[in-house]
């Protein structure tokens, strides 16, 4: 048993070894005499063999060596959440109860939580007792156990209460790590890497080399630590030595010890937000990279050191970004609580700060800190490194001259790595670009055993020992991110790879964009030469599966090279390893980027293989067989594409910039940029063989370049484009850059789009772009509210626009700044430190919602049986989305010149299906965006069509399956003689197609049978609401106030369909217990949802409760449960209940496919086994938060009143997500009353096994216990004696059991209203009528958008700090239309008659409903002119002054009459109205032209009679507007949804 002793503070008290339990026991008993030894651990550790051995050995030895002493043990709950005052007090109480005294020795056996907390117990118990640290995690061994820091956490931060209390011993028994889960093991490596990074470069290098072996062992199913025992002990030992040495120099953290906090300033702040989901080491790992980037940003740390640190951390499986994919899986939605302001506040109260000044440890190089102390850093600089969005401030005073050395060329770097890996011997590669691209290349080369790779000169030099082309397969996919160069080069390299036991093939893959970029021509060429290559996803793009062991045949290879020269270079570099010499012929026209091909040939020559160009055949190359011989050293030239940015900066700002290592002799085509582009634009250019200097003209005096062919330097066109943007006086045309459409993004399109945000017009050319330059003074600042400048995950887009941004008058937001890491990770640092540009971090507002569908994004395909309403509902759908509608059957008929019935009669169903599939393929491609495609019922019969439908849905399109009751369908089809007869019964056809409809669709709507106009209108409204949800146009908002959900617990809702409206009175949602239905087939469940929607216009909570969670659905039927939950999403329910007890795979799948449906994560303790102070409830809540539930629902069972009070405490402590939490049982009713969000309620007509309360019972009880206070509401104005508002509101209060009263208060003076009503303690709110709608506004401290635009207030309610004014008249108008069957959005035209206050509300309502033009008619035109001036121009208002104008009015479908109904219509007004009504008399857009009367007396007005009887318009009486505005007013006043039918009857039934 070898034991290493490390001195600290003058004593050798740190002992490190493997399997040293005996040594620990002997050392403690022999040297720390005590009457009482106490071992404290947590419940997890207590179950391990190592702990059992330690305690057993202790007992045995103690009885022999100190029989008078005793051993006590104590276990605490595990986890950071328990490192608190409560747990500390519990340990202290135990010690006191056991009679422990000042001679007690405590052994803290566990991870950092135990070490910190029990160390603090020892520091304070009896004013300090001895403690021995026995760390059992890697993190604790190398960090928290050494140095005497002890502490507990508080709600405000970690480790804020504690003491320095040095342990008597620290025993690091590495064998304890055998029990450590892989994640915890990896977690500890962060601190190990940290100590090496700040102090010991030699150890850091060892760690770089140890990473692969370490990770393979600790992540294996049965880790064998014995195989890495020596390295593991050394890892712990070296890290402990660094920390012990620093602590010995600075025990109380006065200066030097601060260095141990490298990565912790930012890391601790992140951890404070993300704990417990994120571990300490994971957060510190991210913190180290961010603080290293800060050092680089400040010009202290070389970029290569950041890259090296990042690579090392990644090699140990640690995250280096908050947005690391695996890290995000662990922290879930908590990621979105990591906000800059929160992090800065956390950092400001860090213990190592000087007051509130934030201090960071800055790295100078690997193994050394800058000035051996922590430094004060600005919040602005921290904000910059903490976010991926940047605000570029105006270039106010840049240096007149600058010398910039860009990083190594990406093109040359990638080629050099391929050549070196294929070559024999060792080469030292200098000035290699350290970027994402080259990292992927290095990783791939190493994985394929192409070379042994190491570093020298602190990472500046890459040492490659090539294996002469002897590559072999590896077991894992080679992930290449968005590295196009790496993917193309490695595709040919992979064809040379031999087989190994690990695999028979090589798989190359990348990110989403990489899987769109073309690689087909290269694959075709390689296949023709014997390579076996398979596309695993999309034809022509990655991922690729390349069979090993085939090699290249050689001989003649033909390659299309008009898209990418990288295809050519890929084959050129690998050609010497073919079985025969290669002749590479480039076909299809002039190759793109010839200079890059020349570069490849020149580099191959440097590595010993000379390519000869054919003298007889154009664009043809001869490559001999051979093996590259690596030169001793190869220096990478700086990147000429990157050099264009600092040179362009000089051109645009009138300054001078020199690139000292790129000149006319460069291998790179982009080296010509200064001479060929900037010089003709008015710059002074001085270029030697090895350097380039550009001096720009005075700012604003650049000249446009009528035409430039940039084919030799295509990547530089983006730089040229932003320069051309401020070259006034003409246009600049850039051609020869067609290949830029298939780079990281479509760069030409991106440039046109983003330039427009600066006010610069540009247009695409067949192979280029034309930019119409403007005066620099006319540049616009892109709107931050419109997300600023998009980078498209493209480094060159980001860098180019960073130049143009600085010429704007205000700061410009650029997204995804880190994308520059592809070629110039330090670009922003150069802007900041060299060009002295002010940069700021920016954090966009977070939006968790999926992207809302727009016409420019996707389309909708509608499928379903014949007779299900596809045509009608498709029209509604197109109208709502603003799409075009295409009936594919009609399209087919037009294309073939015959109707379908005749076609089938003549040629049969089989021929028709073939033609249908051809048309489907054409339509799905040609009309994939901005269209609703209504298909024939049998579209799913063909395999090709089915695959196309599935692909469309998989790629984000909506395939909507419409269905209705089969019996109704049969009846409908029997009466329709226009369609071809089925060759079999409808039932048989349905049974055959049913599974196909489900397979091919991602959404499902059950269309109820309609027998009345009201039912038809309700179907339309339900369908539009459904479309709103599945497209994201309108998503259910989680209530913030008190809300309820009525729980439907019936086997068949059709039994109570007529009562559903009464059952749902007062509820904010309806919860359908799917598990309690008599049939859970998809058809029956869909029909039940349709019934719910037909009778209750409320969000649906879709719940399938399993037996173990108090329901009826079998727990073991996991696949059926998944199908039912996915069906709920397809049915477009607002909320889906997802049990926290479900398998993780199920939770992940539902979460990933939820679309716009919200998730309620639920756990029920049906037996009441858990008290609310049990940590398990906290764990369940955290699980709900982690799985990204929108709401967490926790249900217990109360046995006493205290259970309800404990629940209230729990709710106060857990506020990250909305929480539904209550107890069942008689004793739990109080908790149901106190619950805030979606309290489940029952009804007298429903089974109620859970003892739920009704809405009336809840409201009454809540009032009785003081939750509600009695309030008074009033209608004010004059005259109001006939106002129906009191009837409406009081009827609603009574129905919901609310303690409110609504009365009338006649007044013409608002001050009187204030004194008598508003200023009273029981004031609840006002309904305001004339003449007070304007005067009342002086009391409103805040106005709604509607009230501001309309310019009047009809509703006033008290809010914190004042009063909120709203106008619900417009809602009364719009909802009256909608309830009458008018779609909520339609691009029709509207008419408003009148010019008073209600007219303003009518205009606002019609605009909100999507009217493209609103015509105005009134007796006095001057009043209309004033009205038009008060509305924004986009309302598109037009005054109709004459009858002639009325004749020319475009078809009007919506009209609102806002003129007094008790007086005869003015004859001139009447004539104009009649002409307009006559023009809109026919039904279009799926609804009948409709007129709303704003006056509710008399019931039928003259204009209503005219419209209905003479012009056949649908009319809506004014009483409907009154009810609908009151419905919204009721919600504003009380927070409750009004019982609509009840308030309607109260108003209508006088």
From Swiss-Prot:
**Pathway annotation from the record:** Metabolic intermediate biosynthesis; chorismate biosynthesis; chorismate from D-erythrose 4-phosphate and phosphoenolpyruvate: step 2/7; Metabolic intermediate biosynthesis; chorismate biosynthesis; chorismate from D-erythrose 4-phosphate and phosphoenolpyruvate: step 3/7; Metabolic intermediate biosynthesis; chorismate biosynthesis; chorismate from D-erythrose 4-phosphate and phosphoenolpyruvate: step 4/7; Metabolic intermediate biosynthesis; chorismate biosynthesis; chorismate from D-erythrose 4-phosphate and phosphoenolpyruvate: step 5/7
This molecule's function is given as:
The AROM polypeptide catalyzes 5 consecutive enzymatic reactions in prechorismate polyaromatic amino acid biosynthesis.
The GO terms describing molecular function are: 3-dehydroquinate dehydratase activity; 3-dehydroquinate synthase activity; 3-phosphoshikimate 1-carboxyvinyltransferase activity; ATP binding; metal ion binding; shikimate 3-dehydrogenase (NADP+) activity; shikimate kinase activity
The family assignment reads: In the N-terminal section; belongs to the sugar phosphate cyclases superfamily. Dehydroquinate synthase family. In the 2nd section; belongs to the EPSP synthase family.
Which cofactor is essential here?
A: Zn(2+)
Query: Mind telling me what this protein is named?
Result: Pentafunctional AROM polypeptide
Question: So where's the catalytic machinery, residue-wise?
Answer: 253 (proton acceptor), 268 (proton acceptor), 1193 (schiff-base intermediate with substrate)
Assembly, in brief, is: Homodimer.
Q: Which organism is it from?
A: Candida dubliniensis (strain CD36 / ATCC MYA-646 / CBS 7987 / NCPF 3949 / NRRL Y-17841) (Yeast)
- For the ligand (7-phospho-2-dehydro-3-deoxy-D-arabino-heptonate), the binding residues are 127, 143, 149, 159, 191-194, 243, 257-261, 264, 280, 351
Q: Where in this protein does the record put region EPSP synthase?
A: 392-837
**Coiled-coil intervals:** none
Print the organism lineage: Eukaryota, Fungi, Dikarya, Ascomycota, Saccharomycotina
**Which intervals of the chain are annotated as region 3-dehydroquinate synthase?**
1-379
Source gene?
ARO1
Q: Where do the annotations place ATP binding?
A: 864-871
Q: Where in the cell is it found?
A: Cytoplasm
Q: Which GO terms describe its cellular component?
A: cytoplasm
**What are the protein's UniProt keywords?**
Amino-acid biosynthesis, Aromatic amino acid biosynthesis, ATP-binding, Cytoplasm, Kinase, Lyase, Metal-binding, Multifunctional enzyme, NADP, Nucleotide-binding, Oxidoreductase, Transferase, Zinc
């Amino acid at each position: 048993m070898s034991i290493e002793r490390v001195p600290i503070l003058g004593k050798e008290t740190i002992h490190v070894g493997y399997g040293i339990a005996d040594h620990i026991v002997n050392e403690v008993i022999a040297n720390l005499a005590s009457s009482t030894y106490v071992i404290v651990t947590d419940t997890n550790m207590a179950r391990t063999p190592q702990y059992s051995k330690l305690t057993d050995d202790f007992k045995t030895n103690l009885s022999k060596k100190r029989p008078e002493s005793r051993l006590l043990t104590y276990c605490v709950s595990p986890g950071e959440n328990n490192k608190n005052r409560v747990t500390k007090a519990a340990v202290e109480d135990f010690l006191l109860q056991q009679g422990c005294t000042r001679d007690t020795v405590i052994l803290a056996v566990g991870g950092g939580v135990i070490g910190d907390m029990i160390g603090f117990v020892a520091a304070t118990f009896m004013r300090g007792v001895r403690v021995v640290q026995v760390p059992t995690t890697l993190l604790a061994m190398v960090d928290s156990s050494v140095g005497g820091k002890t502490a507990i956490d508080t709600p405000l931060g970690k480790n804020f209460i504690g003491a320095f209390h040095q342990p008597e011993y620290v025993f690091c028994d590495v064998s304890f790590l055998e029990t450590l889960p892989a994640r915890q093991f990896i977690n500890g490596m962060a601190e190990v890497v940290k100590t090496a990074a700040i102090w010991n470069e030699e150890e850091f290098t060892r760690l770089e080399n140890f990473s692969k072996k370490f990770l393979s062992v600790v992540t294996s199913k049965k880790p064998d630590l014995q195989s890495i025992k020596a390295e593991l002990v050394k890892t712990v030992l070296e890290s402990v030595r660094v920390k012990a040495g620093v602590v010995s120099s600075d025990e109380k953290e006065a200066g030097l010890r601060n260095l141990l906090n490298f990565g912790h300033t930012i890391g601790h702040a992140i951890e404070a937000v993300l704990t417990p989901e994120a571990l300490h080491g994971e957060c510190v790992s991210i913190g180290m990279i961010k603080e290293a980037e800060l050092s680089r940003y400040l010009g202290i740390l070389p970029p290569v050191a950041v890259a090296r640190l990042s690579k090392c951390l990644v090699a140990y499986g640690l995250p280096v970004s908050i947005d690391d994919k695996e890290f995000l899986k662990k922290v879930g939605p908590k990621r979105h609580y990591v906000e800059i302001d929160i992090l800065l506040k956390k950092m400001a109260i860090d213990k190592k700060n000087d007051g509130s000044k934030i201090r960071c440890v800055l790295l100078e190089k690997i193994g050394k800190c800058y000035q051996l102390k922590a430094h004060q850093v600005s919040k602005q600089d921290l904000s910059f490194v903490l976010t991926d969005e940047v605000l570029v401030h105006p270039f106010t005073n840049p240096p007149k001259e600058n010398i910039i050395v860009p990083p190594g060329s990406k093109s040359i770097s990638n080629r050099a790595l391929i050549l070196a890996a294929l070559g024999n011997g060792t080469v030292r590669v200098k000035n290699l670009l350290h970027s994402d691209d080259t990292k992927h290349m290095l990783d791939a080369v190493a994985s394929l055993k192409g070379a042994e790779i190491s570093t020298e000169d602190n990472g500046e030099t890459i040492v490659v020992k090539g294996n002469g082309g002897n590559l072999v397969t590896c077991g894992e996919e080679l992930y290449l991110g968005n590295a196009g160069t790496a993917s193309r080069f490695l595709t040919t390299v992979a064809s040379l790879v031999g087989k190994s036991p690990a695999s028979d093939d090589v798989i190359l893959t990348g990110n989403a964009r990489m899987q769109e970029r073309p690689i087909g021509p290269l694959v075709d060429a390689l296949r023709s030469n014997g390579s076996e290559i398979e596309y695993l996803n999309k034809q022509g793009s990655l991922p690729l599966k390349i069979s090993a062991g085939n090699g290249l045949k050689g001989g003649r290879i033909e390659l299309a090279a008009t898209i990418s020269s990288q295809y050519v270079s890929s084959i050129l570099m690998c050609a010497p390893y073919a079985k025969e010499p290669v002749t590479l012929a480039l076909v299809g026209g002039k190759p793109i980027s010839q200079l890059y091909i020349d570069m490849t040939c020149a580099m191959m020559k440097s590595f010993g293989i000379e390519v000869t160009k054919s003298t007889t055949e154009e664009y043809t190359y001869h490559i001999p067989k051979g093996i590259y011989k690596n030169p001793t050293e190869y220096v990478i030239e700086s990147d000429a594409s990157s050099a264009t940015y600092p040179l362009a900066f000089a051109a645009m700002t009138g300054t001078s910039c020199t690139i000292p290592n790129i000149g006319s002799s460069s291998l790179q085509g982009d080296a010509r940029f200064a001479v060929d582009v900037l010089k003709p634009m008015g710059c002074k250019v001085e270029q030697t063989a090895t350097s380039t200097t550009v001096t720009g003209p005075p700012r604003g005096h650049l000249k446009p370049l009528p035409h430039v062919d940039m084919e030799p330097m295509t990547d530089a066109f983006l730089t040229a484009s932003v320069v051309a943007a401020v070259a006034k006086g003409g246009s600049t045309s850039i051609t020869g850059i067609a290949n830029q459409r298939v780079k990281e993004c479509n760069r030409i399109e991106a440039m046109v789009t983003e330039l427009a945000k600066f006010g610069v017009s540009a247009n695409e050319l067949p192979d280029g772009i034309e930019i119409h330059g403007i005066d620099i003074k006319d540049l616009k600042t892109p709107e931050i509210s419109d997300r600023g400048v998009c980078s498209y995950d493209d480094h060159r887009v980001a860098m180019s626009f960073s130049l143009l941004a600085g010429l704007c008058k205000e700061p410009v937001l650029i997204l995804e700044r880190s994308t520059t890491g592809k070629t110039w990770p330090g670009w922003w640092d150069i802007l900041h430190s060299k060009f002295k540009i002010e940069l700021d971090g920016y954090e966009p507002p977070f939006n968790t919602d999926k992207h809302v569908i727009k016409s420019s994004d996707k389309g909708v395909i509608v499928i379903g049986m014949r007779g299900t309403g596809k045509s009608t509902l498709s029209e509604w759908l197109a109208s709502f989305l603003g799409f075009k509608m295409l009936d594919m059957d009609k399209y087919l008929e037009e294309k073939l010149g015959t109707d379908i019935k005749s076609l089938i009669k003549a040629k049969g169903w089989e021929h028709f299906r073939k033609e249908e599939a051809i048309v489907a393929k054409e339509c799905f491609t040609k009309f994939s965006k901005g269209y609703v495609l209504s298909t024939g019922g049998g579209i799913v019969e063909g395999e090709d069509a089915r695959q196309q439908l599935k692909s469309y849905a998989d790629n984000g399109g909506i395939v909507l399956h419409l269905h209705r009751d089969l019996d109704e369908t049969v009846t409908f089809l029997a009466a329709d003689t226009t369609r071809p007869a089925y060759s079999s019964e409808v039932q048989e056809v349905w049974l055959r197609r049913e599974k196909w409809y489900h397979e091919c669709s991602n959404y499902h709507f059950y269309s109820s049978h309609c027998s009345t106009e009201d039912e038809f209108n309700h179907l339309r409204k339900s369908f539009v609401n459904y479309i709103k949800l599945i497209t994201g146009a309108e998503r259910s908002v989680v209530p913030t106030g008190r809300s309820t959900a009525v729980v439907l617990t019936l086997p068949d809702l059709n039994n109570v369909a007529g009562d559903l409206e009464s059952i749902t009175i007062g509820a904010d949602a309806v919860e359908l217990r799917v598990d309690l239905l008599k049939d859970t087939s998809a058809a029956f469940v869909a029909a039940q949802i349709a019934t719910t929607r037909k009778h209750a216009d409320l969000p649906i909570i879709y719940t399938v409760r399993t037996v173990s969670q108090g329901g009826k659905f079998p727990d073991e039927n996991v696949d059926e449960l998944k199908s039912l939950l996915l069906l709920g999403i397809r049915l477009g329910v607002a909320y889906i209940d997802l049990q926290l007890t479900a398998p993780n795979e199920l939770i992940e799948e539902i979460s990933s496919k939820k679309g716009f449906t919200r998730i309620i994560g639920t756990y029920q303790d049906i037996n009441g086994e858990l008290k609310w102070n049990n940590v398990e409830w906290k764990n369940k809540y955290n699980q709900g938060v982690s799985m990204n539930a929108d709401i967490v629902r926790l249900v217990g069972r109360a046995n006493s009143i205290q259970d309800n009070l404990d629940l209230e405490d729990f709710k106060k402590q857990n506020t990250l997500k909305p929480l539904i939490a209550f107890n069942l049982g008689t004793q739990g009713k109080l908790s149901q009353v106190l619950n805030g969000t979606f309290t489940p309620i029952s009804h007298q007509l429903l089974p109620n096994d859970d003892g739920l309360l009704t809405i009336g019972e809840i409201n009454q009880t809540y009032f009785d216990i003081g939750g509600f206070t009695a309030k008074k509401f009033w209608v004010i104005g004059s005259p109001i004696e006939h106002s129906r508002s009191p009837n409406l509101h009081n009827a609603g209060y009574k129905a919901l059991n609310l303690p409110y009263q609504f009365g009338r208060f006649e007044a013409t003076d608002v001050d009187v209203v204030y004194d008598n009503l508003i200023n009273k303690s029981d004031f609840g709110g006002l309904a305001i009528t004339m003449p007070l709608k304007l005067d009342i506004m002086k009391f409103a401290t805040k106005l709604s958008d509607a009230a501001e635009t309309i310019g009047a207030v009809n509703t006033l309610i008290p809010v914190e700090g004042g009063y909120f004014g709203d106008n619900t008249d417009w809602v009364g108008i719009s909802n009256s239309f909608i309830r009458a069957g008018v779609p909520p959005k339609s691009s029709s035209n509207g008419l408003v008659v009148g010019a008073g206050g209600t007219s303003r509300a009518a205009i606002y309502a019609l605009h909100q409903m999507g009217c493209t033009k609103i015509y105005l008619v009134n007796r006095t035109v001057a009043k209309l002119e004033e009205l038009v001036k008060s509305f924004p121009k986009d309302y598109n208002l037009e005054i109709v002054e004459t009858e002639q104008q009325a004749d020319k009015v475009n078809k009007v479908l919506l009209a609102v009459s806002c003129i007094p109904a008790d007086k005869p219509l003015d004859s001139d007004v009447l004539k104009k109205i009649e002409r307009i009504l006559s023009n809109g008399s026919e039904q279009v857009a799926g609804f009948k032209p409709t007129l709303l009367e704003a006056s509710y007396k008399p019931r039928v007005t003259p204009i209503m009679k005219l419209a209905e009887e003479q012009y056949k318009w649908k009319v809506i009486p004014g009483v409907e507007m009154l009810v609908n505005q009151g419905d919204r007013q009721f919600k504003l006043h009380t927070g409750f949804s009004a019982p609509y039918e009840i308030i309607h009857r109260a108003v209508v039934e006088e």
